[in-house]
Amino acid sequence: YGPWQRHVSTMLEGNYEQNWVYRPWFPVDVRDNASCHIRMLESTKVKNGERYIAWSTEAWNVESICARIDELLPEIRLQVTEPREVHPERLQARESRYRALWRAADLRNERMVELTGITFRSFDDSLRDCVESLIAIAGTEVLTSAD
């Protein structure tokens, strides 16, 4: 539960959970989300009642994100950990099926891009900015590796 930034802070602290039913992240940077809202409000093409969703077309498994933080910001010396398993055994037994279902998800942003002209930030840029903010502003403590 909660925004993905909270989950990143738990990764930095070395104590994060597996996503429910092994759902990957499809993150959109909050700055891009805000830009989409503003551009849609300013648009004369949006009709009353139309719905738009800003999806990420990149899917990230939660267990790969912690390692990605270490690759993007080696200077913080993050101790890469595995997520805590939160699923009951009956769901753990179906992990491969759940992951296959999520891999088949075909999320697209063509409508949003066409309407707003937005270019979405890469997940690497969003993740790096998020981690740096969590450390510098929120004071998140990083579980560091012993090297």
Residue positions per predicted region:
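Flexible, glycine-rich beta-alpha linker
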Residues: 1-4
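Alpha-helical substrate-binding/gating segment
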Residues: 8-52
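Short amphipathic alpha-helical molecular recognition features
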Residues: 22-25, 57, 104, 115
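Conserved C-terminal active-site "lid" loop/helix of NAD(P)H-dependent oxidoreductases
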Residues: 30, 88-117
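Mid/C-terminal beta-alpha module of Rossmann-like enzyme folds, strongest
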Residues: 36-95, 123, 129-147
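Short, charged alpha-helical segments
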Residues: 107, 118-129
